[in-house]
Structures are given as C-alpha cells and as structure tokens.
C-alpha cells in the first residue's frame, strides 16, 4: 500500500503547502535612515518584513533604529565607504588605505550609534568594496560583532565574498536598486524586475531610499504582490543557495536550406502508459524527505499516535 493511501491527509496538506515552499523570496531594504523622520515614518508604516539601513552619524540614527527594532524590523548599519568618484564624504567614511585599528574604531562606534543592528551594508563604496585588502580589514572587524554583510554592489568587481573567507562573516548581495531614478514609472519597473528575479531565481534583494516617489510606489505595489512572492528579511536569505539569474542568450536561427530534399518523418514509438500506482510511488519518493513533509509527519505522530496508544484494548 502506498504512503499516500495510508495517510491521505498528508497528500492534501502537502498540496496546500507547496505554493509556500515554492514562493519567491523578496527582501526590501531602505537605506539612508536617520535624516528624514517624516519620510522614514511612512516606511515604518509598511509591512515589518521591510528592513532599514541606518547611517551611523545621522542625527536621528538611534531613534529610528530603536523604533524599527521595536516594530520587529531588521536593522542594518549603513556604513559610508569610499567611492571611485571624487565627492564630499561623510565623517568616518571607510577607505582602503585605513589601518585595521582605524576601521575597527569606526565599526565599533557605528555599532554603538545604531542599536539592534544585525547586519551592515555599504553606503556608496565602489572604491572600498573593490579593494581586497580593505575589505579583509572590514570583515575581520565585523566578525567580532556577528554582523552579516549586505553588499550593495555599487561596483561589479566587489571583493566582499573573497574578503569574508575564513572570518565567519556571511555575505549576501543586492540584485536591484529601486530608485536610481526617482521617476515613479522607473521605480515601478525596477520593483517588477525584483519580483521577476525572486520568482525565477528563488530570492532577490532590492534596495531603495526614503524618497517620496519610492514611498508612493511601495504603498501602491506592496498590497498587489502576487501570492507566489513573500517578503522576507535579509537575514532569511543568508543560507539561500546562490543562483545567478541571467536571461539566456537566444541562439541565432540557422538559415533555411531550400535544397535539402524531402525528409521522411520518423515514426516515434508511443510511450508506455504509466500506471497510477507507479506514478504515485515516484511522486512520493521525490517529496517524502522535503521540509513540508517532514513537518507534517512530525505533527501527525504528535497528534495521532498518542490517541492510538490511549485507546483501551478490547477484551
């Protein structure tokens, strides 16, 4: 007798859980918190799975980090790092030429200024994250605080993953910037792109900012998320397998040769019909060890087995 025949409830429960198990995971992080409480409070009115990254030297850094944490949100340190371009830098911006002691001092002060932080991501930082020696010093400092690193990927040649080797610091990477342009149509396009990547690759991290246009787009589009997309915190993606989503290039079509002559179609042998019991055995064997099934089996033993043992024996 097959496994499903013995426990039909298991099959029904599995079918109910399968959409959740296959849902695309979308993480949204809003950077630059700590300067504009009015805008930031509108972000804090959104679902608590949306996380915030707080600039450590911003005037409202501690206040906004505490408020976000009290709501159950994930808080990150949004640490300024040196860009390739020459522009005014915030105080305590990390540079590749800094000593390990100086980097440790800045990170220690940032941890004090942004309470409840569980991760850190870079503000700008194309020059810093492209430097392997510089990022190795950052990862060594982060390892003392058990913070993960969310790479904002401001440069394609980032060395964050290589630099984390041997430090125990976990690295995850941004897939989409929502608001490089503050045009609402462009932000919607980027939001849709993030959803598509989450659906096809299993997960995606999108980064935005508390601009009025970004806030309006999120207010409009978050309630319309499809059922196969679930909002998650960045830390929930730390152990996700990394699957790069890139559209597959299409092979150029071969030109037709009108002089190939007449080709005869080969008669294919019809496939042998599969019996129902064989089909269910194959399906059962492929999913019995999945997480939803193991959960239900455990619950089944908890709910049903005790009831069976308590039934008095018949004389």
Give the location of each predicted region.
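Bacterial N-terminal signal peptides that target proteins for export
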Residues: 1-9
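Cleavable N-terminal signal peptides
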Residues: 10-11, 21-22
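N-terminal signal peptide c-region/cleavage motif recognized by signal peptidases
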Residues: 16-19
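Active-site beta->alpha N-cap acidic-glycine motif
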Residues: 22-87
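Structural preference for beta-strand elements that scaffold enzyme active sites
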Residues: 25-27, 49-53, 72-76, 118-121, ...
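Substrate-binding cleft of extracellular glycoside hydrolase catalytic domains
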Residues: 68-116
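Catalytic domains of cell-wall/extracellular-matrix polysaccharide-remodeling enzymes
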Residues: 100-191, 199, 209-230, 236
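C-terminal domain-boundary segment and adjacent tail
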Residues: 144-154, 213-314
